[in-house]
Amino acid sequence: VMLALARWLMRGTPYAAGGAALATLVPWLFWLGAAIAALMTLRRGFAPALPVIIAAALPAGWWWAQGDVIPLASILLVTLMAVILRERMRWGETLIVGTLVASVMVQLGIFSPPGGTELMLEQLREGSEEVDRMLTEFANQGYDTQTIAALVVGGVTGLVVLLAAIVCLALARSWQAGLYNPGGFREEFHALRLTPKELAVLVVIG
């Protein structure tokens, strides 16, 4: 079914752009829009795929304005990773770039709650005496609990975005292989090996 969908999408840019836009409009279907954008990028390159990327990003931008940063961040990240994979043909380098960019987004505070963490901390305190006691101890030791909470939320959200981008890229790559190189994705997946240097970089970034 998914391969048939991919075949229909690849009939032309209008099909792919329409599919990406519709998918991203639907809550929790952003991954499909991201995978479509990645498929077009892998197959045709960034410039020819730009209309599809924009079509997926516009509804995701609306979700961003509503407070959900995950769809747009995932689409942008998977597009970048698709460009790297298309040019370098190495999953190791692609994963390193994706992890690095996700880490930078976390550090920039992109994934921090737009309204701050005060309300969230208050709800946590009310819901659990143990959490209330732990947060009080942190505050007594001079730690800013709101900053800690923002870092935790940002880190978890960044991890979700990175995992979503990796899954969407793998899905797009499997579509590409199924349409144009049957069995190629399985061989590529089994051949995936991170060099010690690449593994060390991933550990340091993480």
Predicted regions and their residues:
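Short helix-perturbing small/polar motifs within transmembrane alpha-helices
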Residues: 60-64, 71-113
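Transmembrane alpha-helical segments in integral membrane proteins
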Residues: 156-180
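Small-residue-rich helix-loop
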Residues: 181-206
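Membrane-interface interhelical loops and short interface/amphipathic helices
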Residues: 107-152
